[in-house]
Amino acid sequence: MYTGRFAPSPTGLLHIGSLLTAVASYADARSNGGKWLVRMEDLDPPREMPGAASHILHTLEAFGFKWDGEVTYQSRRYALYEETLYRLKTAGLVYPCHCNRKDWQAGARRGTDGFVYNGRCRHPGQRPALQGKQPSWRIRVPDRDIGFSDGIVGSYAQNLARDIGDFVLFRADGYWAYQLAVVADDAEQGVTHIVRGQDLLVSTPRQIYLQQCLGVPTPQYAHLPLLTNAQGQKWSKQTLAPALDLNRREQLLRQVFRYLKLPEAPETDRPAELLDWAVAHWDMDKVPKHAITAP
């Protein structure tokens, strides 16, 4: 059975880009007779906004979204992540990293998503002294392409050794890394389809590699075009995207429908009816492949 999900992070309130992702993932799930889960990705407490998680859920309800089952919170699933990391340790696929980020990045080259780790701690004899601090844990990556066929973008691949380097699964500050948590959650929740923004396209080969290492199924992916401001920057909390105005729900839904190339919906002041329209007329093939300027 199709199982999709929407997984916001409570580092801020939902904005127009969040709404586009929610509508697209919801419409794709419901039009395929599937389930739509909501997962709160609250992995990084220092970056979270107090009250954001409850506000996000209230906003989704106000826009007419109905999810299946209870909301999942990553902050309550550490035991699952510990078990997942233990499996990788047992298989000899991960190693402790004692490197200081500032030091190793000083001589590192840039890759597809930041600096490429130089692999110093891969070899026990080369690891620097820990100096009383707990290490991070990295996974060894292969020198080969990891690719997939995206439902919107098409073919996409990375050579993880060249483009990314051995990446962190557990941080030295004691927090779980996004890449491990999202793979563990998707597998445990039986997620079969992931519809999300193209800012996460670059993370997908890492997640597929982790799925392969753990022997869990790889979902089907579709990465949506990003909404950008007049300066070409992605609308986000960092670029001061305004929070969704609950007094303009109908207008905002229609705006997102236009971005997703849905036909004009009939007049109604009920957000749930507009979502039903989106489900009935959903066509992934019509979704644009490139960024959309959203004033």
UniProtKB/Swiss-Prot annotation:
A motif ('HIGH' region) lies at residues 8-18. GO terms for molecular function: ATP binding; glutamate-tRNA ligase activity; zinc ion binding. L-glutamate binds at residues 5-9, 41, 178, 196. GO terms for cellular component: cytosol. Pfam families: tRNA-synt_1c (PF00749). ATP binds at residue 237. Its cofactor is Zn(2+). Keywords: Aminoacyl-tRNA synthetase, ATP-binding, Ligase, Metal-binding, Nucleotide-binding, Zinc. GO terms for biological process: glutamyl-tRNA aminoacylation; tRNA modification. Binds 1 zinc ion per subunit. Zn(2+) binds at residues 97, 99, 117, 121. It comes from the Bacteria. Its EC number is 6.1.1.-. Coiled coil: none annotated. A motif ('KMSKS' region) lies at residues 234-238. Belongs to the class-I aminoacyl-tRNA synthetase family. GluQ subfamily. PANTHER family: GLUTAMATE--TRNA LIGASE (PTHR43311), GLUTAMYL-Q TRNA(ASP) SYNTHETASE (PTHR43311:SF1). Catalyzes the tRNA-independent activation of glutamate in presence of ATP and the subsequent transfer of glutamate onto a tRNA(Asp). Glutamate is transferred on the 2-amino-5-(4,5-dihydroxy-2-cyclopenten-1-yl) moiety of the queuosine in the wobble position of the QUC anticodon. This is Glutamyl-Q tRNA(Asp) synthetase. It comes from Neisseria gonorrhoeae (strain ATCC 700825 / FA 1090). The gene is gluQ.
